[in-house]
Structure formats: structure tokens, C-alpha cells
Amino acid sequence: MVGVVSDDQDFLDSKDTMKMAVVLVTPLGNGDLALKFGYPTPHGGCQKMDTTFTEGAVPGQFSNPAMALSDIRVAFSDYQHFALLYLEMRKGGLRNQWLQLYGGRAAGRRPRHPRFGSGMSPLCLHQPFLHAEGGTAGSWCLWPRVPAPPCPSLPLFAPPAPSL
């Protein structure tokens, strides 16, 4: 992950002391995404969490009510070098927006999508993981629904229109 911006007050209060998480995303055959998170704890441990992002009505859109994420979208990406993700969270009666910028590309063999095989190029996103036992890397992949040129440029602080 290259950068994160949000209007979430909890994030703003703790962003200076946060460490990067590792996220492994696995596309499921039904269109959902299985996610495994690993968060470094202050005492050198690792907190793990598994969850599923449920595919929405619009291709490329997901949600996870358990995490209060009502809208997760790939706002802009070239599906090779970078992705800008838009996330909307609703908690305590407030609506918070997040933008997460990812960069990088998977090295070696191209991953295989369960429905599309290896004929489509994913964007593989790497997140450094700061852990007491040494650095490891996590990665996850975003798969385009159909081969398409990059999305048109969108304003950074407005919710993106469906584009996939």
C-alpha cells in the first residue's frame, strides 16, 4: 500500500502510529473475495482476521456489512501497476470515505483466476508487513471483469461512478 486517506476520525487519531497490514485476497468462484488480514500488534505479535467481501450488483463493487463497509470499488486502475480503491464505511451513524492507493506488480508466474483462467491480467498489490520476526510480503490481486482500457480520471474526493 502506497498511501491512505480518510475522513474517519479513528483513523485520523491513530494514523501516525499505525503499521501496515498484510492482506491476502483470493477471488472465489461465485465472484466474492476471501480476505485474510494480518495486523502487527504493538508488542510484536500478529492479529489475524478472515472475512469475505460480497460481490455487489455492479461488477467490481463489493461490500462487507460485518466490517461496516457498504461500498468497496476499484475507482481507477491500469490493472498492471496501480489501483486506487474507494471504500465507504458506515459506523455510529456516520459515513466515512477512504481512498487507498496500491502499487506494484507480482513477480514470476501470473496467478490464475478461478473463473477466467490465466488469460486475464490481474493487478497484484503488495503490502509490506512489519513483523518482529522480520519483514514478509503479502499480495492480493484485482481481476478485471472484461479487458478494457483504464477508467477515465475521477475526482479524488467524490464517490466514483461504476466503471467496471
From Swiss-Prot:
This is Lipocalin-like 1 protein. InterPro entries: Calycin, Lipocalin, Lipocln_cytosolic_FA-bd_dom. The gene is LCNL1. It comes from the Eukaryota. It holds the Pfam family Lipocalin. Belongs to the calycin superfamily. Lipocalin family. GO terms for molecular function: small molecule binding. Disulfide bonds: none annotated. PANTHER family: LIPOCALIN, LIPOCALIN-LIKE 1 PROTEIN.
